[in-house]
Amino acid sequence: RNLGIGSKLLELAEKEMRKMKKNRLYLGRDLLNYFPGLPIDLKNNAEWFEKRGFNQLGNTCDLIKIIKDKNCEKLLLRNNTYTFRLATLADKDGLLELMTKNWPGRWKEEMIEYFNNGGTGREYAIALDGNKICAFAKMGFPQTPEPLESYSLTWRNRFKSLGGIGPLGVDADYRKRNLGYDIVAFANNVLIDNNATEIIIDWTSLLDFYRKMGFEVFKSYLYMTKEF
């Protein structure tokens, strides 16, 4: 450290971004990211980035729930109108349609990569209105192989049997019906049934929403970005 290596690496990264005509650089938040921002544990390093043109834009968190009693930690669903289950390969086109309509960026790309890596659909909890997929939650099981894992399992080696939830979302036409709560509750219950001892929800600022389900802050991060 203190030899200019970090500055040179950042300079090279910025050079490549400019070649690609990009005008904004984020710290973290990339596909298969390590972190969604600068870890609060390293907040003293924020000054280093600020001296190089980065600005702070708020923060985000990873949340955790420790499963002490399987029965007590399970959650009741609020809807009986929709069907909740794990996806299969037969749901691939339906998931692609959902992502293309609502989240055509990284979530769609992550889903495509998941299936290209041999995913069967099992890591996606889905809610259906008839045959239409109207909500999803990506999950990581304690047994999920590494090529199929999401950021929610980044910390898996620190735990006995970690489960993960995220990303997740509800179709724009189905919001404000408690489907967001229910898809998380369903994923929570499935992970408990699969012997998760802890569950992490990654990269969120919805603390009040998830605290209702027993989650608390595990790690915090600073959003930092630089405009070219």
Regions found by a protein language model. Give the residues of each.
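Conserved hydrophobic beta-strand within the GNAT/NAT acetyltransferase core sheet
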Residues: 25-28, 165, 199-202
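Generic detector of contiguous secondary-structure segments
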Residues: 1-23, 47-50, 114-133
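Conserved acetyl-CoA-binding loop-helix of GNAT-fold acetyltransferases
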Residues: 2-18, 165-170, 176-189, 208, ...
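A conserved beta-strand-loop-helix scaffold within acyl/acetyltransferase catalytic domains
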Residues: 103-170
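Short amphipathic alpha-helix that is part of the acyltransferase structural core
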Residues: 60, 73-109, 132-134
